[in-house]
């Protein structure tokens, strides 16, 4: 077994997902009202994590750079990424984290995010084997995608507020893909 200090850390930010089959890797993220879904296929030895800001739906505006903020888009990308790495849909299992109510005056988007993730996974037939959602404080999450081990650390009030500020920033513009062609 690899020691925690020797683990290869891969940080996931809002709007991203990663799929790995490296037993020495740990995925990490910091969550406020955002949700991270951690999925894996224990037989194929592959797993991944996403980090979404808003639940989204078939009627949500999910085009351009904004698509990566929505759970509906990132859940599909994560599942497809796992399947491309040899996972089978019927063996996938999930853990869900985040969805805190970080500001009392805002609508509870964190609760909506968590409910979306649970419903999406139920609709896809993917069992949720663990979750930690809600509350009033953010959390730092670590997930070992091959073993499925997860660990979270609660954030202090000040850390939660910094996370809220990051979550409210506009999405970063998408960088062109290296193989793209720009027309004038």
UniProtKB/Swiss-Prot annotation:
EC id: 3.5.1.44
GO MF annotation: an example: protein-glutamine glutaminase activity
A Gene Ontology biological process term: chemotaxis
Keywords: Chemotaxis, Hydrolase
Enzyme superclass (EC): hydrolase
InterPro entries (alphabetical): CheD-like_sf, Chemorcpt_Glu_NH3ase_CheD, Cytotoxic_necrot_fac-like_cat
Reactions catalysed, as given in the entry: L-glutaminyl-[protein] + H2O = L-glutamyl-[protein] + NH4(+)
Membrane-crossing segments per the record: none
Annotated function: Probably deamidates glutamine residues to glutamate on methyl-accepting chemotaxis receptors (MCPs), playing an important role in chemotaxis.
Homology family: Belongs to the CheD family.
Record-given protein name: Probable chemoreceptor glutamine deamidase CheD
Organism: Rhizobium johnstonii (strain DSM 114642 / LMG 32736 / 3841)
Source species taxonomy: Bacteria, Pseudomonadati, Pseudomonadota, Alphaproteobacteria, Hyphomicrobiales
């Amino acid at each position: 077994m690899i020691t925690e200090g020797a683990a290869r850390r891969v940080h996931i930010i809002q709007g991203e997902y990663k799929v790995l089959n490296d037993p020495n890797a740990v995925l990490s993220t910091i969550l406020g009202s955002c949700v991270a879904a951690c999925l894996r296929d224990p037989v194929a030895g592959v797993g991944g994590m996403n980090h979404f800001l808003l639940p989204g739906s078939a009627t949500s505006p999910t085009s351009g750079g904004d698509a990566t903020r929505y759970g509906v888009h990132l859940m599909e990308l994560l599942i497809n990424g796992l399947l491309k790495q040899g996972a089978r849909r019927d063996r996938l299992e999930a853990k869900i984290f985040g969805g805190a109510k970080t500001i009392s005056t805002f609508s509870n988007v964190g609760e909506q995010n968590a409910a979306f993730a649970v419903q999406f996974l139920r609709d896809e037939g993917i069992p949720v084997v663990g979750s930690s959602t809600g509350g009033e404080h953010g959390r730092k999450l670590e997930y070992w995608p091959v073993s499925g081990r997860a660990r979270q650390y609660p954030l202090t009030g000040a850390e939660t507020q910094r996370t809220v500020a990051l979550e409210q920033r506009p999405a970063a513009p998408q960088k062109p893909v290296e193989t793209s062609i720009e027309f004038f």
